[in-house]
């Protein structure tokens, strides 16, 4: 019986226990047995096992893996490819690096089984530019496996060939998107393609292609070896199996952990990772990486599976859990996220190229205390436009942390907009680092606040519909009130 406070190692079972360069040590611990089994099965039988297991993608939206297999296997073009997406560009994420650096043969085996299932004889591993130091380990492991007959030509004397090649990106985050990744492998600029046609019909080099994340491919061998029923006994009904979580941020114990799907987020933070570092309080958590939803401290008692996280407005995606303590300003965190996204946009589509920049500008105005309530309405309209019209997932997901943070931390945004008091950064009372005297700040017709008051009327009128916030911004709690009580000195 699994203890919910302990890890369950299915994918990480060989971490620290084998030499990652040795295919024989991998084989001695049960490696390549699933591939041997697959080589004696036909394509449909392999796909049926993956279908019955309920395996879903571990890198993005949780698309059923068997459907990618099925679409690619049934494509009319006989030349097909398997592509492993190892472009782990999400800030703070390390799960794929751990798998590739400690157990690369598990990924190779999953790719070879997928190749047998769809009729592909060539696979590519696309490694992010920052992981090129892993090339020696990967190449040594692959060469050793080919020398011993586990992989390559005539694998295990089955008559089936499967060759694995390596390619590296140049550091562009957008190349994690599947069609931009294809463009990069082909030597072109890494920009997303218009779809349809989809990769299972027109993928790498214009051929049917099955592309999956490192973690997804690593799941294939254990499923085929132990059976679909075994796999479904782990996790939840709609999200079977285990998941790798990268926990980072303000916790005592950080790292990559493996738990069954459906583990409780609160348990991970407090029971596994030792709680918030330095005795501080919890402000919020961002799940699924920089493009994931940001929830507040009252929402963390939730199960982590694909559907539950999606229902909260985000995605489980890469499984990154960023823990944010109360010494951080949520508006500033969102602004940093947007700074990352606007720099990583490939610029091909207008919604992402211009929308990302405009979102950054609007949130920057809020963080500096220069915004008004209509700016929140502009953000809402802009994020919805990006979600509906952007060419690829980068533009779609840019909106997620903004929308969810405004929904779950509205009080903090209003505090900045009112230029009242942010308990962390005090930006609500400071514009571009300049402290203004209280009487000028509120009454001078030439000051920013004076001009805004003249345009919109008394400040309280702006918040008649926000009763809770009206209580929050009482004179005693405001920066202005504390300024006056201190005789005009800085708070």
Located regions from the model:
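Ferredoxin-type iron-sulfur electron-transfer modules in oxidoreductases and energy-metabolism complexes
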Residues: 33-49, 78-79, 86, 95-100, ...
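Conserved phosphate/anionic-ligand binding catalytic regions in large, soluble enzymes, centered on
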Residues: 52-71, 169-183, 187-188, 342-355, ...
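Cofactor-/ligand-binding subdomain signature composed of acidic, glycine-rich
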Residues: 1-49
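Short amphipathic, charge-patterned alpha-helical segments
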Residues: 110-114, 261-277
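Short acidic, glycine/serine/threonine-rich loops at helix termini
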Residues: 61-62, 66-69, 93-96, 135-140, ...
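Histidine-anchored nucleotide/phosphate-binding helix
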Residues: 103-117
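Hydrophobic alpha-helical positions that pack around
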Residues: 135-261, 273
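Gly-rich Lys/Arg/Thr-decorated short loops/hinges at beta-loop-alpha junctions or inter-strand turns
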Residues: 26-32, 84-96, 199-204, 246-251
């Amino acid at each position: 019986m699994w203890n919910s406070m302990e890890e369950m190692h299915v994918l990480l079972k060989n971490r620290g226990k084998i030499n990652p360069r040795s295919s024989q040590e991998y084989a001695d611990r049960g490696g390549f047995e699933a591939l041997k089994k697959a080589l004696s099965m036909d394509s449909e039988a392999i796909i049926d096992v993956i279908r019955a297991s309920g395996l879903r993608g571990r890198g993005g939206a949780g698309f059923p893996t068997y459907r990618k297999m099925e679409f690619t296997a049934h494509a009319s073009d006989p030349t097909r490819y398997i592509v492993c997406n190892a472009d782990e560009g999400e800030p703070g994420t390390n799960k794929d690096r751990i798998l590739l650096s400690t157990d690369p043969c598990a990924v190779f085996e999953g790719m070879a089984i997928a190749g047998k299932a769809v009729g592909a004889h060539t696979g590519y591993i696309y490694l992010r530019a920052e992981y090129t130091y892993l090339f020696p380990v990967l190449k040594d492991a692959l060469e050793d496996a080919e020398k011993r007959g586990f992989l390559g030509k005539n694998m295990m004397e089955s008559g089936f060939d499967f060759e694995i090649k390596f390619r590296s990106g140049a550091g562009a985050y957008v190349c994690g998107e599947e069609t931009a990744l294809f463009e990069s492998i082909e030597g072109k600029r890494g920009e997303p393609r218009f779809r349809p046609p989809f990769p299972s019909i027109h993928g790498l080099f214009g051929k049917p292609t099955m592309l999956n994340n490192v973690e997804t491919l690593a799941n294939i061998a254990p499923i085929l070896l132990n059976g679909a029923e075994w796999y479904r006994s782990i996790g939840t009904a709609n999200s079977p199996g285990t998941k790798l979580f990268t926990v980072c941020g303000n916790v005592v114990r950080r790292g990559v952990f493996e738990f069954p799907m459906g583990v409780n987020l609160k348990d991970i933070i407090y029971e596994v990772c030792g709680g918030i570092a330095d005795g501080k309080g919890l402000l919020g958590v961002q799940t699924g990486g920089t493009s994931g939803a940001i929830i507040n401290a009252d929402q963390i008692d939730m199960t982590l599976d694909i559907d539950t996280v999606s229902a909260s407005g985000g995605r489980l995606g890469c499984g990154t859990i960023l823990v944010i303590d109360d010494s951080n300003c949520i508006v500033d965190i969102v602004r940093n996220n947007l700074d990352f996204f606007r720099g990583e946009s490939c610029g091909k589509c207008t919604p992402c190229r211009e929308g990302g920049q405009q979102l950054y500008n609007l949130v920057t105005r809020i963080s500096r205390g220069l915004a008004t309530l209509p700016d929140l309405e502009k953000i809402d309209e802009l994020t919805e436009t990006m979600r509906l019209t952007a060419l690829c997932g980068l533009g779609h997901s840019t909106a997620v942390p903004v929308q969810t943070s405004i929904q779950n931390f509205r009080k903090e945004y209003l505090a900045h907009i009112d230029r009242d008091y942010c308990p962390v950064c005090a930006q609500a009372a400071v514009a571009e680092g300049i402290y203004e005297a209280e009487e000028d700040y509120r009454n001078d017709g030439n000051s920013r606040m004076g001009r805004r008051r003249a345009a919109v009327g008394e400040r309280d009128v702006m918040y008649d519909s926000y009763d809770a916030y009206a209580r929050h911004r009482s004179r005693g709690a405001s920066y202005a009130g504390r300024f006056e009580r201190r005789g005009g000195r800085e708070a």
